[in-house]
Amino acid sequence: MAQKWQTISELAADTSRKVTHSPEEWCRFLTTAARFYKAYDFDDQLLIYAQKPDATACADMSTWNNKMRRWVNAGSTAIALIRKGYGGKPYLDYVHDVADTHPVRGGKDPWLWKLTEENREPVMERLRSAFGIDGAGDLGDLLMEVTDKLVQESYGEYLPDLLYEREDSFLEGLDDFNVEVLFRNTLRASVQYAVLSRCGLDVNRYLDTEDFREITNFNTTAALACLGTAVSQGSRELLLEIGDTIRKIEREKAKNPLAKSDREPYNDSRNFNTLKRERSDEY
């Protein structure tokens, strides 16, 4: 077990180096991480990306079996995550992606929200109200404004840790002011990318690789952890708000099916079961 833990620990370190190698590598990681904003922190997101970058919904075997009534496919490979037990002693926990499971009698699919033409405007109205943003007629522009505001308000909480942990990284040669500017800009672009990606928008309309050119400076595990944690927390706040709004809309649709938009046929039952899910079925 100790050897297995060491292998996964080394995988995490190797992946930290990999994702900071270039803007493209970092953005690929952000795409995966954005799908796991709710239940998994940065360290978990990194290991999920390392082992199954195309994963969409992960849970442990007990959750799949008992709550979702899904069995894990024979021969599938679990995703190992590092946990700390009594006295801080590390151990491994294992989760499986939904693609590696199959439903049995009474089986359920995890609820994964999706932005549509029907729910887009209510989501925008909710975001304007929740975050005090006026204007921004385009959803992408609104998300860019909201994330900018969130980062401006929160990056200072994480900056002291980064200033302390910058030793041996490329940040070490910079003064505090330039580290702050670099961190704020990279954090803002990263949260924006994660949120836009999870919302299914064309990220290239709003950001390009130049916005992530400084990611290579976070080239130690400790420095990247400071950035990654801030990205995870920042995107989580906004994505939870979006998910909650869409869930409420779908619950209302389930209660009043005849009130659906004419654009969506009433007899389209593809998502009927997911409309009945409780919040805890979201991944």
Where are the regions that the model predicts?
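N-terminal accessory/interface modules of nucleic-acid-binding and processing proteins
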Residues: 1-283
